Amino acid sequence: MSPTDPHSLLGLSPGAGEREIKHAFRRLAMRWHPDRNADPAAIEHFKRLRAAYEDLLAEYSRCPAPAAAPHDAQAADARPEPPPEAPPRGADRREDLVLTMEEAFAGGEKAFTIADEIPCGACGGSGEEVLRHTRLCATCHGSGRVRDGRSLTACADCAGRGYLSRQACGACHGSGQARAARKLHVRIPAGVLDGDELRVAGADEDCDRSGGEPGDLILRVVLAPHALYRLDGRDLILSRPVSAFRMLLGGELPIPLPDGVRHLKLESGRATTRELRVKGAGFPGRGKQRAGALIVRLVPVLPEAPDAEILALLEIAESRLQNTLSRHLPDVASWEERWLPDIPETR
């Protein structure tokens, strides 16, 4: 339709009735009448609107719209309308759910916030806002036409009207959408691992705009790095410094776990780096997967800068060890027996 066509100027479709023609002209006249619009180009545009209005009224008076034939209406009523199709189900939405080692170990409920896209409150989701005063289209300078090669075509920016009554919404920048935070409470099973997926059925309201069933929210578990623990499958591994004397003496050793403290029995006799392994005491089992083992790497530590009292006690212990060297320190005894007896002392 040409931008100079009377129907186009008044924003009407071909075949519009007298009432529609008058209503369209009154609406546009309120906007473009020189007494209401200070734009210098408003006078010429108003003249074009009046001319289009008069042409359409004259045409309508000569050729009024024909009334619908009765048999046509009956035929239309006789055709049953097909049932409306059910709106499609919304697509599933995927997000990452970051958990601490303690949260994944014990399970429970965790608050999770997601950002939904909702219709912009400023423009109602249209992406446009109505201008307080219409203005000439800057692309076609109010003519409604632009040159395309050797011909003139309707201006796409103003739909051939020559003026703009709307502009992109300043709040959503024309997208029609806004972001809104929504909080969910997600149940976390005990023993979830990095990469596991949790499905929250029907929780993706962001996909439920067409009236169909909302999609699911799928949360991929991401375990945050921990300063103490690491995982090998479901085996829970940690290193624990221990006094070398405690490793010699043995006894109970407190071990921190994600859900509390557990006391392990430490066998006496060796002050070397070694591992304690407790089957089933690691990460909890889930489904068909069994619980892992707790693996504690014990690292012996000697005292730094011992005071006089500790040195005296150590001297007593060392003297007694020297008396039973072959029993308690066999490596030292064999070495001294091999290399010391026949070597004369030097001054």
Curated annotation (Swiss-Prot):
Keyword tags: Chaperone, Cytoplasm, DNA replication, Metal-binding, Repeat, Stress response, Zinc, Zinc-finger
Renumbered zinc finger spans (CR-type): 107-181
Positions annotated to bind Zn(2+) 2: C137, C140, C155, C158
Binding of Zn(2+) 1, residues: C120, C123, C169, C172
Compositionally skewed regions (Low complexity) per UniProt: 68-77
SUPFAM superfamilies named in the record: Chaperone J-domain, DnaJ/Hsp40 cysteine-rich domain, HSP40/DnaJ peptide-binding domain
Molecular function as annotated in GO: ATP binding; heat shock protein binding; unfolded protein binding; zinc ion binding
Name this protein carries in UniProt: Chaperone protein DnaJ 1
The organism of origin for this protein: Aromatoleum aromaticum (strain DSM 19018 / LMG 30748 / EbN1) (Azoarcus sp. (strain EbN1))
Name of encoding gene: dnaJ1
